[in-house]
Amino acid sequence: MNKIRKGDQIIVLTGRDKGKQGVVSARKDDSHLLIDGINMVKKHVKPNPMKGTTGGIVEKAMPIHQSNVAIFNAATGKADRVGIKVQADGTRVRVFKSSGAEIKAA
């Protein structure tokens, strides 16, 4: 079970975007996340008439490692750690470590 999922509100812990908040838009693999508006870089794109794209400089989000982000707890207004709790019926749910409150699915 991934502790950080698509749609989660996160906060960046390290790097040039430290302190910024965003929403996870995709998981690139088991350890990298794509976050809207975070880790933006400028890429030079060649024009390609076959695809109908014009050339130029495009700004896009690049993946960031999940160890550099933490889930944002709206109740406390701070970054928090995620734990897994097994309920009585055997299902596993994600909870905030600080409060024990269940993390709502996005």
Curated annotation (Swiss-Prot):
- The protein's superkingdom reads Bacteria
- BP GO terms, sorted: translation
Q: Per its UniProt record, what PROSITE patterns does this chain match?
A: RIBOSOMAL_L24
Name the InterPro entries for this protein.
KOW, Rib_uL2_dom2, Ribosomal_uL24, Ribosomal_uL24_CS, Ribosomal_uL24_KOW, Translation_prot_SH3-like_sf
Listed GO MF terms: rRNA binding; structural constituent of ribosome
The keyword Cytoplasm appears for this protein: no
Q: Tell me the protein family, please.
A: Belongs to the universal ribosomal protein uL24 family.
Quaternary context: Part of the 50S ribosomal subunit.
Role, per record: One of two assembly initiator proteins, it binds directly to the 5'-end of the 23S rRNA, where it nucleates assembly of the 50S subunit. One of the proteins that surrounds the polypeptide exit tunnel on the outside of the subunit.
* Protein name as annotated: Large ribosomal subunit protein uL24
Tell me what organism the protein belongs to: Delftia acidovorans (strain DSM 14801 / SPH-1)
| Organism ancestry | Bacteria, Pseudomonadati, Pseudomonadota, Betaproteobacteria, Burkholderiales
Per the record, the gene is rplX
